[in-house]
Each structure stands twice: as structure tokens, then as C-alpha cells.
Amino acid sequence: MNEQVIVQRDPHEPLKTDKREKNWAQHAELIAALVSGALILAGWLLSGYQVLSIILFLLAFVIGGFAKAKEGIEETLESKTLNVELLMIFAAIGSALIGYWAEGAILIFIFSLSGALETYTMNKSSRDLTSLMQLEPEEATLMVNGETKRVPVSDLQAGDMIVIKPGERVAADGIIESGSTSLDESALTGESMPVEKNTGDTVFTGTVNRNGSLTVRVTKANEDSLFRKIIKLVESAQNSVSPAQAFIERFENAYVKGVLIAVALLLFVPHFALGWSWSETFYRAMVFMVVASPCALVASIMPAALSLISNGARNGMLVKGSVFLEQLGSVQMIAFDKTGTVTKGQPAVETIRIAEGFSEAEVLEAVYAIETQSSHPLAQAITAYAESRGVNQSGYISIEETSGFGVMAEVSGAKWKVGKAGFIGEEMAAQFMKQTASDVIQSGHTIVFVKKDDQIAGCIALKDQIRPEAKEVMEELNRLGIKTAMLTGDHEDTAQAIAKEAGMTTVVAECLPDQKVNEIKRLKEEFGTIAMVGDGINDAPALKAADVGIAMGGGTDVALETADMVLMKNDLKKLVNMCRLSRKMNRIIKQNIVFSLAVICLLICANFLQAMELPFGVIGHEGSTILVILNGLRLLK
């Protein structure tokens, strides 16, 4: 019924708005509806003065119906299709033609009031976006040659040094060069707890510096900041149309044509077929045009979807479109990547087992030389452990990395391999574990084997703690009837131990990154609609293969680009909440559609039985539209 208005602005222009002008524009439709209602009341009170009351009703027609008539005519001319706005205007004019001035005016009044309510939903979503945009600073304190000056944030470039004082908002994405503080990142993550930041940490535009003074090196220009990408994502979500909404919009044109054809037939057929008088025939045709209009049906989806998108954005759950909310509401299985999703993504070495004939120092020195060349989380944990044991850097060496398996390099003339059992030899690894470390793999450790030439030199056992909320989340999902699966490259025993601790129902172990897509496809065949939760980096193809890809973003650019939804704060509880709300949205949409169709059928039947007068038809029809919109607004909270 309403075209959505999204707030957009040039990234190089400061945010300055006249609040009074903006408020007036946002409430113009409601004000017009209320004025129309006041004129109707005045016309009713002065009904003894026929000419004066008709003039007042006419004014109510014009003031209350102008916006809708303009919208309907413009849409018809632009798209060459009929719409519900035109149908309601025709119905109001028809009511006036048969002498029902008050009823026609009331129809316009309630129609404009329901339109104002729908506009409120859309404006609420846009206001949430505007509120987010208002958090972006207009100026920054730029440091040049030891001196500072205020400059527009649009002038900042990568490499610039800026100063962030206590109480100020961070003006650009960057890295702290000096200083420490706590930042309020609630604008991005929805999490109110301050986050401690020190030298070398990343900061984002729009977050609030709580106490210490910071010097930050800008890493991205203003238009490329995470803040900007979030705004674009929310704008895209607001502009998106779900399949159900697209169907309703296509259906609207055909339905309106059908109603107008039916009205044309009803102007003549009942008179000749049923013996109705001409006045009764015309009257019933006008009542039919009022009650058969699909206003409530058209408003069944959009207010609910926009309300939930707005709700999610306020609480750190970004959605790229209402279509993904519909799909999340029907998800039967959610697959989780293990590292950084089910677990914290911070593995640590817990124990090291050395084979006979090797020393721990020899093994750690070789492993350290190799793993310092890798960026894998396990490699970083191993190098940190080696450093804590006093191992020093032995210089750069060339490594050969096999993705998902391990790393090979030549150290001091010997050929060393560091990686999974399959990388160094399954049988050799199994025999070593049986003899030396059978207890380790049973307790959920990730095992990294070390091989020198043709002998196993030892193994390193690492463990990543599961997220504290993981078990509770899996239980909640199970109560919702949603199955859970964990996809991991770990050994079967390790994967099973972690899955058992987290309370997950299905485990796919020893799954390489390129195999996750096939596993997602298999799970889709088995369970139907599938969601995939990951970090958005090494599992991007799997996120795309799922019906709904959800990234534990922590505010990363990659997560925003690869996933359909992003958990800005790595809290799995928000996922459960969004699953509940998505299901609630689907229920509300179904309720709205069934209710609106039932009301239309009931009113049409009552009209043909001559058991309903026009005023009751107006109230029943427009009242159902208002109830449908109010039902959708429940998702704002």
C-alpha cells in the first residue's frame, strides 16, 4: 500500500537535519487523517444543515484522501497496473454518488488512518537507520607533524593519524597506535558492556571512547568503514521484498481488476436475475467494492518484516533481506562450524608428547620454525607455547602448505611435517597414539602430529574451550525442533567429545573446507531448509550453499559480505532469539492473511444476503486493516 522511503545521504555531506521539518513530514499523513476525522465529526454534528454538512464531508474527502489518491494515480501511471488505493477512492466516490456522504468520508478517514499506521512502521525502520547514521561523527581531530586540527571525516584517508579524546566517538576505522581505554561498541554490536582496547587493537567508527585518550592510525577511508557497510546493509534489507510480499504485490493488480469487473457485473445482473431495484443493485455494488478491497491482505507482510528487521538491527543482528527471515523461520537444521563458532576460537596447547629418540627442545624448535610462517589459529597457539618454553626464532624458511591438512618444510637438512594424521600417515599416527597418547584424543583435544623424515617425532594436543552459552543454545534450538550439526576438520573422537559437551545432535568430522559445501547439500536433502553458522571467512562457500548463511562476524568486513545474517556480537543466544522471532513473524503473516481473507469473505456474504449496510462494511473492512498492521508491529519489541 505504501512505497517505502529510505533515508540516504551523500557520505561526504554532514548529518544536519531540521527536526521540526522532518517530524512534520513524517506525521503529515496522520495529521491529514485526524483533520479528516474532525471534519467528519463536524459534518455529523451539523447534519441538520445539509449543504454545510456535505461541504464538510467533501473537505474530509479531499484532505484525507489526497495523499492516497496521488499515490495510487502515480503508481498506476508508472507501473501500468491497478492498485488498492484507486479501488478505495472509487468506492468512496461511489458512496457519495448514492448519497452516503458520511460513509464515504469515514471510509477515506479510516483508510488514511491505516495508511498512516503503515507509514509509521516504515518510518520507524528508517528512523532506526537514521539514529544509527547520527552516531557517525562529522569531524575528526587530525594530527599532522605533532599538531592537531579539526577536519571533516570525509577528508580522512588510510594512514592518517587521529586523536580520540575521552567521551568522543571514534571518527574512523583504525588501529590504536598509543593509549588504552574502554569502548562502548553498542552502536555496532548491541552489547552495552564496554570493551577494553589497547595499543594494536582495532577500533570502529561510531563507537564511544569511555575514558583514555587514543592516537589511532586510520586504516580505511570514511566511505569504506564498517559503519558505512552496516548502513548500506540495513538499507538493502529495508528495500528488499520477500517472495510472499512479491506475490501479494503481483496478486494485488489482478485482484483489483477482478473486483472492478465484478462491480460492473453487479451493477446490472442482480436487477435482472434477482429482481433487485436499481437503487438496491447500485448500493450493493458499491458496498461490494468497499468490502472486497484487499487493503488488509496487502498490509499483511511488509509491516511485520520491517518491524523484525528494525528489531534485529537494534540488537546486533543484521539481516540482508526479509526473505532470509522467512527462511530462518522454517529452518529444520542449523549446521555450525566448530572453531570460533561452537568454540571460542582461541585454542591453546595443553600437552605435548615426544617419541623415543627425540627431545622436546628439538621438536619445538623445528615446529616453531615452521609454524611461524603460518597464520592458522593452531599454528599461532603452538608458536605461543614454544615461545613460553624459551624457543627463539631460527630465521625464515620456505614452507609448503596443504590446505586443511598440514605444513611441510626442510629444517636443518631434515624434512619435517606438521599436521593431521592423514598428512603424516594414518597407520603411523594411530600406532603412536595407541602407544603414547591414547588418553588425549578421548578428551576432545585437537591433535597436531610432528614427523621428521620417516619417523613420528611427537604430537601436540590443543584444546579450544566451547562458548559458555553453547550448550544452553543447543538445548533451546532442540526445544524449538531444530536439529544441530557440527562441521569440523578434527578427528572423529575429538569432534564427538566437543559435540557431546555442547549437546549437538549430529557431527561431521574430518571435513575439509571444500567438503563443507557437499555436506550442506547433503543435509539439505535430509532435513530441508538449512542454516549455516560460521566465521564468514574460510567457510564462505558453505554459508552461500545454505538457505541462510549466518556469520559470527565480530564486526568483520568479510562476514558482512559473505553472509545473509551477521551476529555483530559473537553471542549465539541472539541466534536463538532471531529464530524465535522469525517463526513468530511467519505465524503473524499467516494470521494476517487468513484473517484478512476471512473478513473479506464474511463481508461479501453479508452484503449479498442484504444483511449489512455500508457503514458496517466500512468499519469491518478498514478495521481489519488496522488490526493486521498492529499485529505486525508486535515484532518491534
From Swiss-Prot:
Induction: By hydrogen peroxide. Repressed by PerR.
Inactivation phenotype: Disruption results in low transformability, which can be rescued by the addition of excess zinc.
Topology versus the membrane: Multi-pass membrane protein
Subcellular location: Cell membrane
Protein name in the entry: Zinc-transporting ATPase
Gene behind the chain: zosA
PANTHER family found in the cross-reference section: CADMIUM_ZINC-TRANSPORTING ATPASE HMA1, CHLOROPLASTIC-RELATED (PTHR43079:SF1), PROBABLE CADMIUM/ZINC-TRANSPORTING ATPASE HMA1 (PTHR43079)
Classification of source organism: Bacteria, Bacillati, Bacillota, Bacilli, Bacillales
GO function term, MF aspect, one: metal ion binding
GO CC annotations, alphabetized: plasma membrane
One Pfam entry name: Hydrolase
Enzyme class: translocase
Reactions accelerated catalytically: Zn(2+)(out) + ATP(in) + H2O(in) = Zn(2+)(in) + ADP(in) + phosphate(in) + H(+)(in)
Known function: Couples the hydrolysis of ATP with the transport of zinc into the cell. Plays an important role in protecting cells against oxidative stress. ZosA-mediated zinc transport is required for post-transcriptional control of comK and competence development.
Organism: Bacillus subtilis (strain 168)
Active-site residue numbers: D337 (4-aspartylphosphate intermediate)
